[in-house]
Every structure is written in structure tokens, then in C-alpha cells.
């Protein structure tokens, strides 16, 4: 397995400079989703003082022709700050700033700025207090694309001992996981936990519960932090939903969803109603649940390795081979939440959460989202 050249630089030398005082100035790292709908870009600017809220942050611009978001002849694009976090790499008072991207200033979002519409949809149902929790699976790779810790000319032992495993022969890359976890806590990201997954070198972290639009904000920033931590260690975190073909588990982003009514007494009734609506709109959700409209998920949702079949909708209590799982405790208590197991690891959480709201709460039907008037 190959690690990056940058990871071999002397980090102690860097720390000499990072410990220098920065006066009253603040470094703000602006983050946005590029034209792939999966990749993240970032750049930093200096502020004269520490911003207390996202509204105090200035808008900025970038070259969209270099991020697959515009043509070179008209490449200026705009960044509008949307959410602000503490910077775990430069530390206080510096900030991470998740931004929405726009083609022309104030004239419509970029194609991969799915947050813009998601925010409108979330605002329409804010009185129902939708909560989400997303389980982000990922796989650690060397820069040569070989899974971290796997034999160079073969495969590790079969799946079985790796899920929540302990020991050098079972847990591959825990240092990265622990560093990411602590960095998220420092940043203020709502990370709920982490665990080793079924395939060796595959891990999961959970974000939530988050209400409304904050689900996407927190997951995207958690992904950014993971990429930056991996950069320091010289490895890659991939969200490919099936990074290794064959008899190995894929990677998903199981999404847990509830409303205030579902969480209250006899909320199971509303959970079952939502599942019935989802059953009639399966293909719409499949298209919304990965950035390639279902093509990525087709490699993962095979009906094997704890997945449902991409062509069929199913639901059940404690059933990890179903499209929708109702946790056993929810079935017993008759209130709580349900888990949509279809989203791929590389999904856009804004797309996933918006689709759930449209179908379950706005009662949309059909294969296309409804266009609401402003």
C-alpha cells in the first residue's frame, strides 16, 4: 500500500509555525461541493476579527471552470456561507465555513448546490420537527487504490471478525478513526459514534440527530474533516458504494428519520403511513440516493451483503435486508423512527433528506419532484 508524499513531511517543523501567534486575525476555510456532486473544494481567507455567526461572514468567489462547474469564458462563481464550525486543524479562533455555490451572484444555485432547494423544503415542514441521523460508511485506501492493511498480492481472511473488531489483525486504521472522531467533536459536528464495519478497512461514523437542513451541513463537514485527517496520514477515504467487487460488503449511508408525531405515543402509526408512501415511490428515491441517479447503488443493492435489491421495495422489523428497517425497539414501543437503508455512501445528504420530506410529509407522488412556487 502506498501513502502520499505529503504525509512523509516533518510535521514537527510545521508545528513550529502553527504555534506562532496570529494576532486579531482569523483564518476562515470556505468549503463547497464541486461539479461532481461528491468532491469537496476549499480555500482560506483572512478575517479581521472572529465571526460570531454565519451571517457575519463575507461572500466570496472562485473559478468554476476549475471545479467542473462552469465554462472558462464565464467562470466566476460565488460562495455564500451557510454553516460555520470551529477549525480542528488550525484551532480557535479559526473557522470552517460550509458554503452554497451560485452560478451568478443572487441568480440561482449551481447545479450541485442541492442545499438551496433542500432548505426551502425543510422550511415548509419545520413545524413537524423532522430529525435525521445518517450512518456514513467509508473505506480506507492507499494512494494506489489498494485497501489499507490488505495484503499486497491477495486478500485478507473472510468477513466475520472485522465488524466492531479489536486487535491488529481485525481493526485496520483505528488511529485515523480516533483522530477524525475527536476533530469532529472539537469542530462542533454532531457525531454520535463510530465503529469498524464488516469489510476490513471499512469504518462507519454516525451523525445526528440533526433537525432539518443541519443534517446535510453536519455530514458534509464531517466528510471534509475525514478527508483532511486522511490527508495528514497519507491515505484516502473513499465513499464508493462498492469499492471492492466480489464477496465483500459495500458501503452505504443508512438514514434514520422521524417527526415529532412519530416520536410521540402511538407514533408507529405515522411511521407505517410514511413507509406506505415510500413503497409507491421507490424509483424516485433510488435516483435521489446516489449522485449518478442510481447507477452507483446498482453495484451495491444486490440483495446480498445486508442490502435489499435495487429493483424491489421491502420493509420489515429488524430486517437488514429490507429497503426500510423498523428497529425492534420501535416495534415494541410503538414510537420512534425508521431506517432507510437504500442511500449509498456517496449520496448527497441534502438530496436524501429532501426526498424523504417530499414523499413522507408533503405527500408527493410520481417520479419527479413537485415544483413549488416561491
UniProtKB/Swiss-Prot annotation:
Residues 114-374 form the GS catalytic domain. Glutamine synthetase activity is inhibited by methionine sulfoximine (MSO). GO terms for cellular component: cytosol; endoplasmic reticulum; mitochondrion; plasma membrane. It is a lipid-anchor. It catalyses: L-glutamate + NH4(+) + ATP = L-glutamine + ADP + phosphate + H(+); L-cysteinyl-[protein] + hexadecanoyl-CoA = S-hexadecanoyl-L-cysteinyl-[protein] + CoA. SUPFAM superfamilies: Glutamine synthetase, N-terminal domain, Glutamine synthetase/guanido kinase. SMART domains: Gln-synt_C (SM01230). Mn(2+) 2 binds at residues 137, 197, 204. Its EC number is 6.3.1.2, 2.3.1.225. Residues 24-106 form the GS beta-grasp domain. It is found in: Cytoplasm, Cytosol; Microsome; Mitochondrion; Cell membrane. ATP binds at residues 135, 204-209, 256-258, 320, 325. ADP binds at residues 337-339. Glutamine synthetase that catalyzes the ATP-dependent conversion of glutamate and ammonia to glutamine. Its role depends on tissue localization: in the brain, it regulates the levels of toxic ammonia and converts neurotoxic glutamate to harmless glutamine, whereas in the liver, it is one of the enzymes responsible for the removal of ammonia. Decamer; composed of two pentamers. Interacts with PALMD. Interacts with RHOJ. Interacts with BEST2; this interaction tethers a fraction of GLUL to the membrane, causing a decrease of cytosolic glutamine synthase (GS) activity and inhibits the chloride channel activity of BEST2 by affecting the gating at the aperture in the absence of intracellular glutamate. Belongs to the glutamine synthetase family. This is Glutamine synthetase.
Amino acid at each position: 500500500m502506498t501513502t502520499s508524499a505529503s504525509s512523509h513531511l516533518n510535521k514537527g517543523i510545521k508545528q513550529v509555525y502553527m504555534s506562532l501567534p496570529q494576532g486579531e486575525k482569523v483564518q476562515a476555510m470556505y468549503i463547497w461541493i464541486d461539479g461532481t456532486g461528491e468532491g469537496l473544494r476549499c480555500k482560506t481567507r483572512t478575517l479581521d476579527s472572529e465571526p460570531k455567526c454565519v451571517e457575519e461572514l463575507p461572500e466570496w468567489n472562485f473559478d468554476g471552470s476549475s471545479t467542473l462547474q462552469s465554462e472558462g469564458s464565464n467562470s466566476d462563481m460565488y460562495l455564500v456561507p451557510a454553516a460555520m464550525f470551529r477549525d480542528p486543524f488550525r484551532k480557535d479562533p479559526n473557522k470552517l465555513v460550509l458554503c452554497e455555490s451560485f452560478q451568478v451572484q443572487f441568480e440561482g444555485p449551481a447545479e450541485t448546490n442541492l442545499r438551496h432547494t433542500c432548505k426551502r423544503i425543510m422550511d415548509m415542514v419545520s413545524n413537524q420537527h423532522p430529525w435525521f441521523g445518517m450512518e456514513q460508511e467509508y473505506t480506507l485506501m492507499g494512494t494506489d487504490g489498494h485497501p489499507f492493511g490488505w495484503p499486497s498480492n491477495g486478500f485478507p481472511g473472510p468477513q466475520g471478525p472485522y465488524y466492531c473488531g479489536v486487535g491488529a489483525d481485525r481493526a485496520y486504521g483505528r488511529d485515523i478513526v480516533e483522530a477524525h472522531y475527536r476533530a469532529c467533536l472539537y469542530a462542533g459536528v454532531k457525531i454520535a459514534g463510530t465503529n469498524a464495519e464488516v469489510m476490513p478497512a471499512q469504518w462507519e461514523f454516525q451523525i445526528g440527530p440533526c433537525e432539518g437542513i443541519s443534517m446535510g451541513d453536519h455530514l458534509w463537514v464531517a466528510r471534509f474533516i475525514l478527508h483532511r485527517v486522511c490527508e495528514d496520514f497519507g491515505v484516502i477515504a473513499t465513499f464508493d458504494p462498492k469499492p471492492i467487487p466480489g464477496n465483500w460488503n459495500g458501503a452505504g449511508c443508512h438514514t434514520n428519520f422521524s417527526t415529532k408525531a412519530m416520536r410521540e405515543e402511538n407514533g408507529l402509526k405515522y411511521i407505517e403511513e410514511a413507509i406506505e408512501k415510500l413503497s409507491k415511490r421507490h424509483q424516485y428515491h433510488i435516483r435521489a440516493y446516489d449522485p449518478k441517479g442510481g447507477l452507483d447503488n446498482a453495484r451495491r443493492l444486490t440483495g446480498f451483503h445486508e442490502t435489499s435489491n435495487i429493483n424491489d421495495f421491502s420493509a420489515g422489523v429488524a430486517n437488514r435486508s429490507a429497503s426500510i428497517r423498523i428497529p425492534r425497539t420501535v416495534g415494541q414501543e410503538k414510537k420512534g423512527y425508521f431506517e432507510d437503508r437504500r442511500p449509498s455512501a456517496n449520496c448527497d445528504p441534502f438530496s436524501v433528506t429532501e426526498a424523504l420530506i417530499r414523499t413522507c410529509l408533503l405527500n408527493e407522488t410520481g417520479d419527479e419532484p413537485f415544483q413549488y412556487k416561491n
